[in-house]
Amino acid sequence: MSMQDPIADMLTRIRNGQAAKHVSVKMPSAKLKIAIAKVLKEEGYITDYAVADEAKPELEVTLKYFQGQPVVETIQRVSRPGLRIYKGKNELPKVMGGLGVAIVSTSKGLMTDRTARQNGMGGEVICYVA
């Protein structure tokens, strides 16, 4: 089976792992996935992440719970291989009225919508997390 959208696969593994109350989830590693995990950790949506550098690098994401409930309520892919979504600095969406974050790929790397707005940058909207 070929994987057409590895980012959607990562988000689905996180969503399913939290629904099943797993401590962590493992997936094939890639630079973009590591960057997404870094942003999720900085925003407090996951506890930690680690890359096991073996023959096939594997990314392990440690999930976060608060009072037994998953911290991530929704995690949704926006821009996908078949339909890329780009937004300018003034068009960046506010997820759940500012309570959630949109992860945006800019020329300066991956960042949240708030950081991109502060830096006056737009880019490709990768996903929404709330």
UniProtKB/Swiss-Prot annotation:
Pfam families: Ribosomal_S8. One of its GO terms (biological process) is translation. Keywords: Ribonucleoprotein, Ribosomal protein, RNA-binding, rRNA-binding. One of its GO terms (cellular component) is ribosome. The keyword tRNA-binding does not apply. Part of the 30S ribosomal subunit. Contacts proteins S5 and S12. One of the primary rRNA binding proteins, it binds directly to 16S rRNA central domain where it helps coordinate assembly of the platform of the 30S subunit. Belongs to the universal ribosomal protein uS8 family. This is Small ribosomal subunit protein uS8. It comes from Shewanella piezotolerans (strain WP3 / JCM 13877).
